[in-house]
Amino acid sequence: MIDFKLYAITDRRLCKPKLIQDYVASLLDTGVRAIQLREKDLSDTELRSVAVPINHICKAYSAKLFINSNIGVATDVGVDGVHLPESLLDTIQKAKARNLLVGCSVHDLDVAQKMQVAGANFVTYSPIYPTMSKPNPAVGLKSLRRIVGALDIPVFALGGITPSKVPECLNSGAFGVAAMSSVMSYETGIDQAKNYLKQIEEY
């Protein structure tokens, strides 16, 4: 069940000098209830060592934890789900067979529909607005509305979304919003997470 509206995506480099597990705990303190552990440079062993304490923390807060791309580690650690890129479309059924929730990254309607048919529980659609972290051109709100209208699963808007842009994304049909750099910044991320949640609550 997808019962969260803000999907926080990690980048441990941004929250230094704080350890990522401590930073995630601070995010959960604000009311965030879904984390995607996206540390793609780590080996399986390293990822597992990070995921285990974060999973314990998430369970203490009744929050969901998704691991990016790595079905094996997700299964071993016992997290709630995985988040898969378009290139791993063929592994959705493998993840579902292991009772994992599946989120997928999509950038166009055709792939989004294929992900839904394959069994994805939700998708992130990006980039809605121009952003340094996404090389693709911004797709805009009109395209977001089109994707939402074509799918039966929740769509999370991602890419260049500041808290002030949350209402127009939700108004365009997004189930929620996803954010990485804005919520992972050591200096401002926690306050930004609060601002996202406030906009969602007031919508």
Each language-model region and where it sits:
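A short acidic, helix-capping loop that chelates divalent metal ions and anchors anionic groups
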Residues: A74, Y129-K134
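Generic secondary-structure boundary signal with a strong preference for alpha-helix termini
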Residues: A138, N171-S172
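Substrate-recognition "cap/lid" segment bordering the active-site pocket of phosphatases
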Residues: K134-G140, R145-I147
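Conserved N-terminal beta1-alpha1 strand-loop-helix module at the mouth
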Residues: M1-L89, K94-F122, R146, D152-I153, ...
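Active-site phosphate/pyrophosphate-handling residues
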Residues: G72, K142, A178
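Short, glycine/charged-rich "phosphate-handling" switch motifs in NTP-dependent
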Residues: F175
